[in-house]
């Protein structure tokens, strides 16, 4: 029995554990493992705390982002309203300006028509006076009624103008 290798391996193993027990290595080993477990628990608590803090920060940033988006939408809506108002004002101003220019053009056309009519009348009067002068001069003796002819022509000119 003492000659087998298994016996001596068992004896050495028991002796090794006895020496470890005598030097109280199991307590040191347990204390080290307990310390390591406490460190791991502390790290887990710190990780939970950091996770909660990160979730709070994320929620805060998401809320701020929603507020910023809402504010941006409000700004865009206000800009659209202002742009529509400006477009309406511009359209109204353009219509007023077109009406003014149309009225001015119509006035100029009416004035040009009146001027053209007056020019035609003046030309017709001059032609009529010239024709009347020639007809009267041909029918009336030049010496006898020259004064009458001149008087009639001046009256005719003033009446035609």
Swiss-Prot record:
It comes from the Bacteria. Pfam families: ATP-synt_B. Keywords: ATP synthesis, Cell inner membrane, Cell membrane, CF(0), Hydrogen ion transport, Ion transport, Membrane, Transmembrane, Transmembrane helix, Transport. It is a single-pass membrane protein. GO terms for cellular component: plasma membrane; proton-transporting ATP synthase complex. GO terms for molecular function: proton-transporting ATP synthase activity, rotational mechanism; proton-transporting ATPase activity, rotational mechanism. The chain crosses the membrane at residues 1-21. Its main location: membrane. It is found in: Cell inner membrane. CDD domains: ATP-synt_Fo_b. F-type ATPases have 2 components, F(1) - the catalytic core - and F(0) - the membrane proton channel. F(1) has five subunits: alpha(3), beta(3), gamma(1), delta(1), epsilon(1). F(0) has three main subunits: a(1), b(2) and c(10-14). The alpha and beta chains form an alternating ring which encloses part of the gamma chain. F(1) is attached to F(0) by a central stalk formed by the gamma and epsilon chains, while a peripheral stalk is formed by the delta and b chains. F(1)F(0) ATP synthase produces ATP from ADP in the presence of a proton or sodium gradient. F-type ATPases consist of two structural domains, F(1) containing the extramembraneous catalytic core and F(0) containing the membrane proton channel, linked together by a central stalk and a peripheral stalk. During catalysis, ATP synthesis in the catalytic domain of F(1) is coupled via a rotary mechanism of the central stalk subunits to proton translocation. Component of the F(0) channel, it forms part of the peripheral stalk, linking F(1) to F(0). Belongs to the ATPase B chain family. This is ATP synthase subunit b 1. It comes from Parvibaculum lavamentivorans (strain DS-1 / DSM 13023 / NCIMB 13966).
